[in-house]
Amino acid sequence: MAVDLNYEKDSKERIPYEHYLEVYQNADPKEISSRCDVPYDAEKQEFTVSLMGVSYRISWPEYNVFHIGDDGSVSPIIGWYPLEKKPNAKILVLRYLTEGGAAPSTGKFLTYREIPWGEVYFKQFQGRCLFRLAFGFGGKLDAFREIMERVGAQAISSGDVGYELEFMKGLFVRLILWAGDDELSLIHISEPTRH
């Protein structure tokens, strides 16, 4: 007897997106705002969230996403706005809004392995992040610098080239590279006071 697994090619994005969207739509926006420390405009029914230096308005309960300028208005499409188009970015922010919570940083940075459950998923992280970063930019430090500066990252004195980027409000990531090394790169994440 054959088992129908109902597997679809896009199930790794569509199914989680639909799940977390339903959770988001049934959540209390005021509770989300308080827990995640993200502003919520009850009149407009919109959150304001920052991702990689770009501010976005996110409607509730629809989850329509628009990047906004410094004056708070929807700005023209001039840059890269992953939260508007990329399913993985949409899922990440949905998960943060439905399950996450803001916590002040301890001021220390952790490697991925030091984060709770980091050791369990380290091989996947190593392949998807560390090796790609090192292989893609280990011999192209100028290109790495240009990209990091474009997204608003600040140079730090680590490795041959290092940058610190505020990924989300209060969550900083450090990306560190060594010239010509296609195997060694480091990514450090700021440690919250609670996990």
Language-model segments: residues:
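Short Lys/Arg-enriched alpha/beta "domain-start" segment
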Residues: A2-Q45, T98-V151
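Amphipathic, interaction-prone secondary-structure segments
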Residues: S33-N64, Q154-A179
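Aromatic- and glycine-enriched beta-alpha-beta binding-site module
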Residues: S59-G127
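Short, charged/polar micro-motifs that form catalytic or ligand-binding hotspots
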Residues: G79, L83, A134, V161, ...
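General structural signal for secondary-structure boundaries
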Residues: K85-K86, F137, R194
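Phosphate-binding glycine-rich loops and adjacent basic patches that engage nucleotide phosphates
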Residues: A103-T111, M168-A179, P192
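Short glycine/proline-rich, acidic loop/turn segments that cap or connect secondary-structure elements
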Residues: A179-I187
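Residue-level detector of conserved catalytic or cofactor/ligand-binding positions
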Residues: I187-H195
